[in-house]
Swiss-Prot record:
The gene is rbgA. One of its GO terms (cellular component) is cytoplasm. The keyword Nucleus does not apply. GTP binds at residues 58-61, 86-87, 130-135, 174. Essential protein that is required for a late step of 50S ribosomal subunit assembly. Has GTPase activity that is stimulated by interaction with the immature 50S ribosome subunit. Binds to the 23S rRNA. Required for the association of ribosomal proteins rplP and rpmA with the large subunit. It is found in: Cytoplasm. This is Ribosome biogenesis GTPase A. It comes from the Bacteria. SUPFAM superfamilies: P-loop containing nucleoside triphosphate hydrolases. InterPro entries: G_CP_dom (IPR030378), GTP-bd (IPR006073), GTP-bd_ortho_bundle_sf (IPR023179), GTP-bd_ribosome_bgen (IPR019991), GTPase_MTG1 (IPR016478), P-loop_NTPase (IPR027417). Transmembrane segments: none annotated.
Length: 283
């Protein structure tokens, strides 16, 4: 499943982000805490060069907290300060400015020594579509400035946003992978709703989700669908879920499209509890 999804505004965004780097002090790299590697754009390292950076593990409330802790340690071992946040309810957002000041202390001390008038920290927010950039900006700015939505690709224009007197943010359109050569990356992004359902095979996503749950959270899978045991054959598992959820066609046959929708919706709406689809040790 090689998915290619690179609208023109994303290619343009890459060029504009590269140009804007000379205007900013620090980069906030926003990733989905459930899939920190799959929700990182592989071009980001190349684009950002040596800019100071803070990794923001967003949607931390939807992820397995013990795995998020391991990811935090993983990135910090690589020298990237990392915060677990929730841009919807504000969890962890009060740590962003202090962490930025700490990281930029030497730069701002040098500016002060040269007699440069103090100014706000200028930050660039980067991330793939639907990772929560607009929600984060609105929460920090305490007003509805950036368009938000659960559709990938909502933000399409870059804009500066003032956050008090000490921080200015530059939002960018989500820059997604030009293509997903690793099938797992595409499946993980699809399972969390980061890419449009119209460009993927949803049954593949449902199969991935069930196998993932069977391997990592089997008791949650059994509890959700009232299963005594998890059938080995994926078709049999679909049949069981279809029956339990009443996804039937005339004549009592299983409606696999409906069953697929139920499984994906249950994953995305946290009916299995907080899930982490990636662990540092598996990368």
């Amino acid at each position: 499943m090689v998915i290619q999804w690179f609208p023109g505004h994303m290619a343009k965004a890459r060029r504009e982000v590269t140009e804007k780097l000379k205007l900013i002090d620090i980069v906030y790299e926003l990733v989905d805490a459930r899939i920190p590697m799959s929700s990182r754009n592989p071009m980001i390292e190349d684009i950002l060069k040596n800019k100071p950076r803070i990794m923001l593990l967003n949607k931390a409330d939807k992820a397995d907290s013990s795995v998020t802790k391991a990811w935090k340690q993983h990135f910090e071992k690589d020298g990237i300060p990392t915060l677990a946040i929730n841009s919807v309810n504000g969890q962890g957002l009060n740590q962003i400015l202090p962490a930025s000041k700490e990281l930029l202390k030497e730069k701002f001390d040098k500016m002060k020594a040269k007699g440069v008038k103090p100014r706000a920290i200028r930050a660039l927010i980067v991330g793939i579509p639907n990772v929560g950039k607009s929600t984060l900006i609105n929460r920090l700015a305490k007003k509805n400035i950036a368009k938000t939505g659960d559709r990938p690709g909502v933000t399409t224009a870059q804009q500066w946003v003032k956050v008090g007197k000490e921080l200015e943010l530059l939002d960018t359109p989500g820059i997604l992978w030009p293509k997903f050569e690793d099938e797992l990356v595409g499946l993980r992004l699809a399972a969390t709703g980061a890419i449009k359902d119209s460009i993927i095979n949803l049954q593949d996503v449902a199969v991935y989700g069930l196998r993932f749950l069977e391997e990592n959270y089997p008791e949650r899978l059994k509890k959700r669908y009232d299963l005594e045991e998890i059938p080995e054959e994926i078709a049999a598992l679909f049949d069981e879920i279809g029956k339990k959820r009443g996804c039937l066609m005339a004549g009592g046959e299983i409606n696999y499209d409906k069953t697929t929708e139920v499984i994906i919706r249950d994953i995305r709406t946290e009916k299995f509890g907080p899930l982490s689809f990636e662990k540092p040790e598996d990368m």
